[in-house]
């Protein structure tokens, strides 16, 4: 179309996604006396697949959101697939290193996971006795992946505790030197005594990989160079997004009916509530995996997010 028309783009309601899922709820009362115990379970799972992106089938993929890794809708893949740079591997799955001993990057972006969980669920326990009730909610999300941008940046800058190994001899660092004190000559491991006049460093790390010809890597990298490598390889910063949380604890008291009759009230209850109290289990490091999941398209991509917060409150419910 000629540029003279002024037309540049058009928004379309396009694309087809196939979703198949299940949702179930179950409530039981194990104890029903003066003391009552109620338990409510819920479970949900969904499987999606992108069928098409446009009616003319001109598109095979579409970038939904980007950080370093990207969320790309691709025909044949689950919606929410994460794509990014990955380690270069041989036929046996071993990571291949380059001439310096650093991990090599696959020239083609790879599917690194999907941000949608395999399943989610929760258990709500309510314990009641003589007008006092205690509610405890534990919920969980299992499966799915997250790009941890905080980990990527923290590893690159060396501010995380996970970058401590290898930074000095007392932390497992390997001693090495540069022949002639020229870094262009590459690193050489100190075996016994180093040559006279060279500077010896003790922050060496050997990446666990193989050379292009399949031999075990023996090249030493300075710790700083070693840790900086991973920022540019998205696969190194992909984590399992599963978690289990103590989501809510609520302690309630229902005022006796005899106190309410003079006020013509049907019921009054006072509750103390705490939310997001404890991450019981998570597979991410340094962040709450939930911070990367919102209502937008950029789910599964996290970058230097603020910590999640606990909240406490008082509820007053009055029935007239």
Located regions from the model:
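Surface-exposed, extracytoplasmic segments of Gram-negative outer-membrane nutrient-acquisition systems
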Residues: 1-14, 48-115, 124, 133-238, ...
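Transmembrane beta-barrel architecture of outer-membrane proteins
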Residues: 7-8, 16-22, 43-49, 116-121, ...
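Membrane-embedded beta-strand positions in outer-membrane beta-barrel channels/transporters
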Residues: 11, 21-25, 38-40, 122-124, ...
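Transmembrane beta-strands of outer-membrane beta-barrel pores
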Residues: 28-30, 43-49, 129-131, 140-144, ...
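Repeated loop/turn-to-beta-strand initiation elements of outer-membrane beta-barrel proteins
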Residues: 34-35, 131-136, 258-259
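Transmembrane beta-barrel strands of outer-membrane/channel proteins
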Residues: 39-45, 127, 136-140, 170, ...
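Outer-membrane beta-barrel transmembrane strands
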Residues: 41, 113-130, 139, 234-255, ...
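Membrane-interface anchoring segments and C-terminal beta-barrel signals
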Residues: 92-94, 195, 199-320
């Amino acid at each position: 179309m000629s540029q003279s028309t002024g037309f540049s783009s058009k928004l379309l309601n396009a694309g087809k996604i196939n979703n198949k899922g299940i949702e179930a709820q179950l409530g039981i009362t194990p104890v029903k006396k003066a003391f009552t115990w109620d338990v409510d379970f819920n479970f949900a799972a969904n499987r999606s697949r992108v069928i098409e992106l446009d009616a003319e089938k001109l598109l095979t993929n579409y970038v939904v959101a980007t950080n370093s890794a990207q969320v790309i809708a691709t025909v044949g893949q689950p919606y929410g697939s994460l794509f990014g740079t990955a380690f270069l591997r041989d036929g046996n799955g071993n990571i291949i290193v380059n001439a310096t001993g650093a991990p090599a990057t696959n020239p083609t972006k790879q599917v690194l996971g999907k941000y949608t969980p395999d399943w989610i669920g929760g258990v709500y326990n309510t314990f009641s006795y003589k007008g006092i009730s205690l509610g405890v909610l534990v919920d969980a999300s299992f499966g799915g992946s997250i790009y941890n941008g905080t980990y990527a940046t923290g590893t690159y800058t060396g501010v995380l505790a996970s970058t401590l190994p290898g930074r000095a001899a007392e932390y497992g660092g390997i001693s090495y030197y540069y022949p002639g004190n020229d870094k262009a000559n590459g690193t050489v491991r100190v075996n016994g005594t180093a040559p006279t006049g060279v500077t010896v460093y003790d922050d060496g790390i050997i990446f666990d990989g193989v050379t292009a010809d399949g031999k075990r890597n023996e090249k030493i990298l300075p710790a700083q160079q070693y840790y900086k490598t991973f920022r540019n390889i998205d696969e190194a910063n992909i984590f399992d997004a599963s978690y289990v949380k103590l989501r809510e604890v609520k302690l309630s008291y229902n005022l006796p009916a005899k106190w309410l009759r003079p006020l013509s009230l049907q019921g009054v209850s006072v509750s103390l509530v705490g939310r997001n109290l404890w991450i019981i289990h998570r597979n991410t490091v340094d962040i709450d995996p939930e911070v990367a999941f919102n209502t937008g398209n950029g789910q599964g991509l996290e970058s230097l997010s603020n910590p999640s917060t606990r909240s406490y409150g008082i509820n007053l419910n009055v029935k007239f």
